[in-house]
């Protein structure tokens, strides 16, 4: 690995990335969001940049104009062809992988002060093959994370080169790229919050762990963790958990700064921090202004979420800690992969507490690995309110740590470089471990990409892991019907209708399944399904009544129907017509 030149390393990364994501090129349009988005842009005869950046619509949700712009370009270039759009996603992910390679190379040169050509290659391969990337790459609507990642990684690359004393134009370009990332996805504001961390970077700093010794640090960490653990377990007070974390931060701060020789000018720190904090404040203000110009009002779900957050702050802290613990675990142990995650195990709260205490160490460190770790955590912040399940279609999602994983991988590689500097004899062992991890990751990722190729396999996997959600069943039923698997669709519809609660407007599944049965000539089966669905809706569904009446009239017109059966069908038709008239009268 050490002798492999940069061009060969890049070719290896690209080749492995495309080999693993090759199945993505033949994936269908996902029934969740992708189909609706593509249909919407297909239906628009004309579209202007003003409509994308300033639509002036009411009930605005996400403000991500760059995504709309990408769909517009797809329409102009290749008529929104799904294979080419999937190819775009794979290429964009590969671009991010190359950016991780160059960012890690700059970080290694800056942090280790020596050339370690294999560390950037390891970082790029781990990011390229990490199973957590599959959702963002395969789901066309998930391109938001990839686009945001490109601009954020370009910003980091420019900042690292600026820190090494290169042109100040790089700083301006880094800020501009970070602002552009916010137009792809709001999570980029987490990166903007962390920008001042680069101003605090110091090469000669000594970490708290190194000051105290590893065993002394671990002992202190465990004491505070156990205190927080039992407070959360026995009393459920997460306010006290935060208090313990603050005491822990004060404790290690005293130990750190009591012996540390601060060699960097405080004026320089204040100067650059002030500049970057001002940039964040201005960019946040500009984003809010753009959003208000784009939408006449915001979707009610956003307000509902903030109301829930403030209603019980102790619960909010618990929910956020659990989410952080869940995502950090997903980075190290991504399995099982799931497209729809509504809730997580409450035990992740305790993982989140450990991450919170580690955060205290990271925030005091001015080393580059700590900065990258913190940036990965900060990129998670905007996704935490989604855990309430009121904004997005799923409360938790693997794609939320797509970019965080890049920062954490770089941090792990930098720490690994530190450790190998003290233990050079272990380099061969570490190299073998990286190769093994990459092989396992590539196998998992390739297999997951095959699942994503087909709506039936994707939704079957999702329903298997989350069987209690009715809307997932309905999407699965549609996928089955689109593939002509009517019998299996009927089976799953009947299972959902009898075992899962009905949703408002849930008649769509009944209409889809019955429509396919009618095409097959199974009119009696379709009629029975309509009647069961009408009963579950208390005969209040207008679309179901209309469809049932049409079916009854068609069945009456068949010449071979016995007279007695014809009268029965006519009676049902009259009954449902009366119910429909009653609904129209009450409108």
Language-model features: locations:
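C-terminal luminal/periplasmic domains and tails of membrane-associated envelope-modifying transferases
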Residues: 249, 457-587
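Polytopic membrane enzymes that build or remodel cell-surface glycoconjugates and lipids
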Residues: 1-488, 494-512
């Amino acid at each position: 690995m050490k002798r492999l030149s940069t061009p060969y390393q890049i070719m290896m990364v690209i080749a492995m990335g495309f080999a693993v994501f090759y199945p993505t090129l033949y994936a269908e349009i996902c029934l969740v969001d992708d189909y609706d988005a593509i249909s919407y842009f297909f239906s628009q005869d004309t579209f202007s940049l003003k409509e994308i950046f300033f639509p002036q619509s009411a009930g605005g949700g996400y403000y991500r104009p760059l995504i709309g712009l990408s769909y517009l370009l797809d329409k102009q270039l290749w008529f929104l062809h799904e294979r080419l759009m999937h190819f775009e996603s794979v290429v964009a992910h590969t671009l991010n992988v190359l950016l991780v390679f160059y960012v890690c190379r700059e970080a290694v040169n800056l942090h280790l002060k020596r050339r370690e050509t294999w560390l950037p290659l390891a970082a790029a391969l781990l990011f390229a093959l990490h199973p957590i990337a599959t959702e963002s790459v395969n789901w066309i609507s998930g391109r938001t994370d990839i686009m945001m990642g490109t601009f954020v990684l370009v910003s980091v690359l420019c900042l690292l080169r600026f820190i090494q004393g290169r042109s100040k134009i790089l700083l301006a370009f880094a800020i501009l790229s970070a602002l552009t990332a916010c137009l792809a996805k709001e999570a980029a504001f987490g990166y903007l919050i962390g920008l001042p961390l680069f101003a605090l970077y110091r090469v000669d700093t000594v970490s708290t762990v190194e000051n105290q010794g590893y065993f002394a640090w671990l002992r202190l960490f465990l004491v505070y963790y156990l205190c927080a653990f039992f407070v959360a377990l026995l009393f459920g007070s997460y306010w006290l958990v935060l208090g313990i974390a603050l005491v822990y931060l004060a404790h290690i701060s005293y130990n750190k700064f009591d012996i540390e020789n601060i060699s960097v000018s405080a004026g320089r720190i204040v100067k650059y921090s002030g500049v970057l904090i001002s940039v964040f404040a201005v960019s946040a203000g500009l984003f809010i202004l753009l959003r208000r110009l784009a939408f006449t009002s915001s979707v009610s779900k956003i307000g509902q979420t903030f109301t829930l957050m403030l209603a019980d702050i102790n619960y909010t802290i618990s929910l956020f800690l659990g989410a952080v613990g869940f995502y950090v675990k997903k980075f190290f142990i991504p399995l099982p992969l799931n497209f729809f995650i509504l809730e997580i195990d409450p035990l992740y709260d305790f993982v989140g507490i450990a991450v919170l205490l580690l955060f205290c160490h990271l925030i005091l460190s001015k080393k580059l690995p700590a900065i990258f770790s913190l940036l990965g955590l900060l990129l998670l912040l905007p996704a935490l309110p989604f855990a309430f399940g009121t904004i997005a279609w799923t409360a938790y999602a693997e794609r939320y740590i797509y970019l965080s994983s890049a920062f954490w991988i770089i941090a792990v590689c930098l720490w690994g470089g530190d450790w190998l500097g003290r233990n050079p004899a272990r380099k061969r062992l570490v190299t073998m471990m990286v190769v093994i991890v990459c092989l396992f990751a590539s196998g998992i990722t390739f297999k997951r990409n095959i699942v994503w190729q087909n709506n039936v396999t994707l939704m079957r996997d999702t329903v298997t892991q989350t069987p209690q959600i009715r809307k997932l069943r309905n999407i699965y039923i549609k996928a089955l019907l689109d593939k002509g698997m009517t019998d299996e669709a009927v089976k799953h519809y009947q299972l959902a209708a009898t075992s899962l609660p009905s949703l408002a407007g849930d008649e769509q599944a009944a209409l889809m399944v019955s429509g396919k049965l009618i095409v097959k000539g199974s009119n009696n089966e379709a009629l029975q399904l309509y009647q069961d669905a009408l009963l579950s809706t208390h005969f209040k569904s207008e679309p179901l009544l209309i469809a049932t009446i049409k079916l009854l009239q068609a069945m009456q017109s068949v010449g071979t129907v016995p007279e007695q059966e014809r009268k029965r069908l006519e009676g049902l038709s009259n009954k449902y017509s009366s119910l429909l008239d009653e609904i129209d009268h009450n409108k």
